[in-house]
UniProtKB/Swiss-Prot annotation:
It comes from the Bacteria. It is found in: Cytoplasm, Nucleoid. GO terms for molecular function: DNA binding. Pfam families: YbaB_DNA_bd. GO terms for cellular component: bacterial nucleoid; cytosol. This is Nucleoid-associated protein CE0210. HAMAP family: DNA_YbaB_EbfC. Keywords: Cytoplasm, DNA-binding. Belongs to the YbaB/EbfC family. Homodimer. The lineage of its organism: Bacteria, Bacillati, Actinomycetota, Actinomycetes, Mycobacteriales. InterPro entries: YbaB-like_sf, YbaB/EbfC. SUPFAM superfamilies: YbaB-like (SSF82607). The keyword ATP-binding does not apply.
Length: 107
């Protein structure tokens, strides 16, 4: 039985590390928009999870029904958060196979 070629293994590990770093940078440079009520409330979130904008259509602002607006903002935030997680899984998932595991649960 022959020993594995350590230089080849090291080269593969370095290549995977470079791909992983590129995927991480792509995720961090990305932006997603979560929405609720067919876009009447939107939350823009960076790939790092930072909320960069919240837009609320005046049609959903009712001073007598603040709870609905709160629910819509929360729904838009959760939608944006899910989209960031989906983006991370899309970019990192194929790379995680090389590590023998699913990294999607990290995001």
């Amino acid at each position: 039985m022959t020993q594995p070629d350590m230089s080849q293994i090291l080269a593969q590990a370095q290549q995977m590390q470079a791909q992983l770093q590129a995927a991480q940078q792509e995720i961090l440079a990305s932006s997603v928009v979560g929405d609720a009520a067919n876009g009447l409330v939107t939350v823009t979130m960076s790939g790092s999870g930072e909320v960069t904008a919240v837009n609320i259509d005046p049609k959903v602002v009712d001073p007598e029904d603040v709870e609905t607006l709160q629910d819509l903002v929360q729904g838009a935030f959760l939608d944006a958060h899910k989209k960031v997680a989906d983006l991370a899984q899309e970019k990192m998932g194929p790379l995680s196979q090389g590590f023998g595991g699913d990294m999607g649960s990290l995001f």
